[in-house]
């Protein structure tokens, strides 16, 4: 574990913010979006990300140019097991390590996003720096149903922020999900011609974007590829990110038909969003946040596991008219064709969905979380001085 240098001159240094959101992309990406917003608001801010060796943060945080401190992971067992017996020891170890980090960077505020590192971060902040003051906490909940770590953290947090009003946490301020600026600042109309040329689509094409997260989604892959002939016959082009470990069973390409562009992974989601008129995707919190932030209507297919939070994530935009919900069990080639073709061939309906999707987004979420963090940190520092 790296050690930050301790600065005892509390009033003369920049604000020190610790971001606790390691594990999955759904925890790391919002934290990095807030980090970027913090730096834009206060160039002197010191930003430290807290993570574990097993999380995506070991790659994503250094890529974004931020400091990363590693602690022991504290996975919370969903069912009674031997891991549950070892949990108290793991929590104590992680809290001790986290307190060392908070002391080392002289933290002014902890912003937690849930996940493996959030619980020890909340508990360490509540216990205070080694021999010194407590550290105020800001909690952000991205999902429609709050996890255990954030439910614990929210009890003593100075501010509780959420993507939706009914996440199960009390006294929340709804700010949306923080999304990186390269997405929130995207002008789809201005970039459309370049984006479509990049993927080989005609400038006036009707484009369906298909993706299932970084690893793809097998049920979505099967259903959309099964609808390939019907989509082509309707004049619809497809950009399909199927996942690096997956392949698609596509019919032989017809040189006269609109292109079906299949790729393992999309490095430039901004170009993909700009090229598309409609998306088929899962409804994880980050996916819904990005798709609505750019005003792209979507057919959401919630992942059929967990506690149903993916369905809940999509409901606000669906209820607003910016998307549709299709259950994974109902997904088939016929379902895709019957749903997609009427949308992409009806200009007025597509325009209405696009407008509704745009109004459902929260493109300023990262900035709002960053502003709250700085406000809490400055108030705490003023009180301590």
From Swiss-Prot:
Topology in membrane: Peripheral membrane protein
Swiss-Prot/TrEMBL catalytic activity: di-trans,octa-cis-undecaprenyl diphospho-N-acetyl-alpha-D-muramoyl-L-alanyl-D-glutamyl-meso-2,6-diaminopimeloyl-D-alanyl-D-alanine + UDP-N-acetyl-alpha-D-glucosamine = di-trans,octa-cis-undecaprenyl diphospho-[N-acetyl-alpha-D-glucosaminyl-(1->4)]-N-acetyl-alpha-D-muramoyl-L-alanyl-D-glutamyl-meso-2,6-diaminopimeloyl-D-alanyl-D-alanine + UDP + H(+)
Family annotation (CDD domains): GT28_MurG
Signal peptide: none
Annotated Gene3D superfamilies: Glycogen Phosphorylase B
Biological processes annotated in GO: carbohydrate metabolic process; cell division; cell wall organization; lipid glycosylation; peptidoglycan biosynthetic process; regulation of cell shape
Residues that bind UDP-N-acetyl-alpha-D-glucosamine: 24-26, 143, 180, 214, 310
Subcellular location per the Swiss-Prot or TrEMBL entry: Cell membrane
GO cellular component, one term: plasma membrane
PANTHER family: GLYCOSYLTRANSFERASE, UDP-N-ACETYLGLUCOSAMINE--N-ACETYLMURAMYL-(PENTAPEPTIDE) PYROPHOSPHORYL-UNDECAPRENOL N-ACETYLGLUCOSAMINE TRANSFERASE 1
HAMAP family named among the record's database cross-references: MurG
Family: Belongs to the glycosyltransferase 28 family. MurG subfamily.
Primary role: Cell wall formation. Catalyzes the transfer of a GlcNAc subunit on undecaprenyl-pyrophosphoryl-MurNAc-pentapeptide (lipid intermediate I) to form undecaprenyl-pyrophosphoryl-MurNAc-(pentapeptide)GlcNAc (lipid intermediate II).
Name under which the protein is recorded: UDP-N-acetylglucosamine--N-acetylmuramyl-(pentapeptide) pyrophosphoryl-undecaprenol N-acetylglucosamine transferase
């Amino acid at each position: 574990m790296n050690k930050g240098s301790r600065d005892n001159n509390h009033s003369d240094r920049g604000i020190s913010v610790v971001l606790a959101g390691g594990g999955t992309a759904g925890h790391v990406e919002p934290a990095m979006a807030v980090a970027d917003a913090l730096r834009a608001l206060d160039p002197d801010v010191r930003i430290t990300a807290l993570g574990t060796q097993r999380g995506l943060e070991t790659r994503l945080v250094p890529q974004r140019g931020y400091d990363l401190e590693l602690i022991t992971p504290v996975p919370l067992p969903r069912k009674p097991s031997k891991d549950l017996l070892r949990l108290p020891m793991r929590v104590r170890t992680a809290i001790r390590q986290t307190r060392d980090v908070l002391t080392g960077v002289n933290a002014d505020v902890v912003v937690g996003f849930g996940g493996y590192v959030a619980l020890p971060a909340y508990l360490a902040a509540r216990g205070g720096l080694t021999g010194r003051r407590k550290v105020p906490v800001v909690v952000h909940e991205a999902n429609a149903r709050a996890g255990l770590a954030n439910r614990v953290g929210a009890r003593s947090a100075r501010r509780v922020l959420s993507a939706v009003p009914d996440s199960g946490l009390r006294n929340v301020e709804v700010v949306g999900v923080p999304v990186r600026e390269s997405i929130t600042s995207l002008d789809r109309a201005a970039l459309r011609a370049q984006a479509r040329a990049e993927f080989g689509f005609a400038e006036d094409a009707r484009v369906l974007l298909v993706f299932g997260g970084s690893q793809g989604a097998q049920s979505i892959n099967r259903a959309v590829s099964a609808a390939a002939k019907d989509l082509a016959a309707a004049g619809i082009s497809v950009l399909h990110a199927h996942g690096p470990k997956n392949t698609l069973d596509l019919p032989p390409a017809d040189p006269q038909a609109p292109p079906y562009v299949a790729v393992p992974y999309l490095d430039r989601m901004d170009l993909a969003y700009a090229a598309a008129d409609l998306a088929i995707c899962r409804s994880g919190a980050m996916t819904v946040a990005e798709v609505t932030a750019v005003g792209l209507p979507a057919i959401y297919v919630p992942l059929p596991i967990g506690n149903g939070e993916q369905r809940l994530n999509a409901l606000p935009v669906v209820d607003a008219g910016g998307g549709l919900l299709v259950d994974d069990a109902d997904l088939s080639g016929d379902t895709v064709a019957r749903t997609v073709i009427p949308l992409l061939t009806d200009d007025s309906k597509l325009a209405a969905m696009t407008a509704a999707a745009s109004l459902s987004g929260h493109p300023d979420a990262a900035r709002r979380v960053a502003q709250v963090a700085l406000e809490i940190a400055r108030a705490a520092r003023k009180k301590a001085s």
